[in-house]
Amino acid sequence: MRKVAVVTGCSYGLGQEIADRLINEGYFVYGLSRTKPSIKLFAAPDTFQWVECDISNAEEVRLAFEKMGVFIDVLVNNAGVFEYGEFSSQSMKTIDKIIDLNVKGTMYVTKAAQKYLSRGSNVFFINSVAGLYEIKNESIYAASKHALTAFAGILGEELRNDGIKVTSIHPGGIDTPMQRTNPNKDRLLDTKEITNTIVHVLNSKATYKTIKLFSEFEWHQ
């Protein structure tokens, strides 16, 4: 029987690349996002299904997992939002947007998915170096990622006896559409470094709680 993966934030960028890689690894992938992914993921309808879902809405998330209704071998919490700037310049709306999606949304997804996980399942959190360090002008984003670092670590301990592995991946700058204007774009991490890491963990018997991936250029250094 084909294994099943669920990837959030799959409409473009890293999420789309993760979904595509898992399809190539033989998984049937359910992609959760607010906007429809590119035609690339729909090339083989027997390997991918898009589920429209705003993960910051707990009821939409609950209904999405009920609609899928399948046991999940791999859950990739990838969806997230980033805004750069000093805390004094950030609006209340920005605070809500980042916390609602990056923290609450990820928790909603993980909570809804938990009843469909079983021994041997893997849960991934696409975190950030901002979840490990204090980075100037990223106060809200870093706070959201630090929250996920703690959440993933504790969840991993809680699920260990159930045979479910939890891995938090902390990449530096990634070459995605979000980084189009970065003057050091040619020195960013290739998305393949993240997808290769996921596949490595899936093929390994070892448990990796935290994985750090640094590009040559790191703005926090």
Language-model segments: which ranges?
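N-terminal Rossmann NAD(P)H-binding glycine-rich loop of SDR-like oxidoreductase domains
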Residues: S11, A19
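Active-site helix of classical SDR
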Residues: T110, S144
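Alpha-helical segment proximal to the catalytic Tyr-Lys
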Residues: K115, E157-N161
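Residue(s) in the substrate-gating loop at a strand-loop-helix junction
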Residues: S128
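C-terminal helical subdomain
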Residues: S168, P183-Q221
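Conserved NAD(P)H cofactor-binding loop of Rossmann-fold oxidoreductase domains
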Residues: N78-E83
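Substrate-binding pocket helix/loop in short-chain dehydrogenase/reductase
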Residues: E86-F87, T94-I99
